[in-house]
């Protein structure tokens, strides 16, 4: 299991938090995702054999946010 912090631009409210956390939770291999709005970050626990960082970034970007 890997823990990764991803920097995300454009999140500002609970709707943003829910959108990003839900998108990541749908990915096979993600065990948890927690958004920190103050830091513009999401902390993700995942199985690197089942999901890639690139797939997680795409899921976030598909919700309309920019991954830095």
Swiss-Prot record:
Query: Which residue intervals define the domain HMA in the entry?
Result: 2-68
InterPro entries registered for this protein in UniProt: CopZ (IPR049740), Cu-bd (IPR000428), Heavy-metal-associated_CS (IPR017969), HMA_Cu_ion-bd (IPR006122), HMA_dom (IPR006121), HMA_dom_sf (IPR036163)
For this record, an example GO cellular component is: cytoplasm
Q: Record's Gene3D superfamilies? A: 3.30.70.100
One family from Pfam that matches here is HMA
* Residues that bind Cu cation: 13, 16
Q: Which GO terms describe its biological process?
A: copper ion transport
Tell me a Gene Ontology molecular-function term this record carries.
Answer: copper ion binding
Does the entry feature the keyword Chaperone, yes or no?
yes
Q: Which domain of life is it from?
A: Bacteria
List keywords of the entry alphabetically.
Answer: Chaperone, Copper, Cytoplasm, Metal-binding
Q: Report the subcellular localization.
A: Cytoplasm
Q: What is its main location?
A: cytoplasm
The answer, when asked if Metal-binding is one of the entry's keywords, is yes
Q: Which PANTHER family match?
A: P-TYPE CATION-TRANSPORTING ATPASE (PTHR46594:SF4)
Known role: Chaperone that serves for the intracellular sequestration and transport of Cu(+). Delivers Cu(+) to the copper-exporting P-type ATPase A (CopA).
Q: What is this protein called?
A: Copper chaperone CopZ
- Origin species, per record, is Staphylococcus haemolyticus (strain JCSC1435)
Q: Name the lineage.
A: Bacteria, Bacillati, Bacillota, Bacilli, Bacillales
